[in-house]
Regions:
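Short helix/turn-capping signatures at newly exposed starts of structured segments
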Residues: 1-142
Length: 142
């Protein structure tokens, strides 16, 4: 079982530049999108990440210097082998995940398709009431 931690993307602590991810993720693809009417752009790094023998889609997005968002797809065939801070994610609805997190002393809120951990800057995205993606973001990101 792979256990995700609050400190960030596995093996990629928050606060790193997107180039750090690019060097460590073989076969990654960078996409740069200019934001109309501004002098800013979003850099998005798409890659596959192996976690204990299974591959997961991963994305790192950077807007500006210090604002990084990292996402990992957690659904799929091996979704029953993933956990967050020791809490198995398989079979948990958004409401059940919030209840379990709160029992562990982690502040959590249910959104329309998310479970937000505002003090940790972590979000779980749900589709059909199944956790599909986990995202970590630096506090500057949003």
């Amino acid at each position: 079982m792979y256990d995700f931690k609050r400190e960030g993307f596995p093996g990629f602590p928050l606060g790193q530049k997107i180039e750090f991810y690019e060097r460590k993720l073989p076969g990654s693809r960078m996409v740069v999108t200019d934001l109309p009417g501004t002098d800013r752009s979003i850099r998005t790094l798409h890659s596959r990440l192996a976690l204990e023998g299974s591959e997961h889609s991963s994305i790192a997005c950077q807007l500006g210097e210090g604002d990084l968002v990292s996402l990992i797809e957690i659904s799929g065939a091996d979704g029953d082998k993933l956990s967050f801070e020791g809490l198995p994610l398989a079979g948990l609805s958004a409401e059940e995940l919030v209840a379990q997190l709160r029992e562990r002393g982690i502040a959590a809120e249910v959104g329309s398709v998310t479970v937000e951990l505002p003090k940790l800057n972590i979000s779980f995205f749900f589709f059909e009431d199944v956790p599909r993606t986990i995202a970590w973001q630096t506090s500057e990101a949003f």
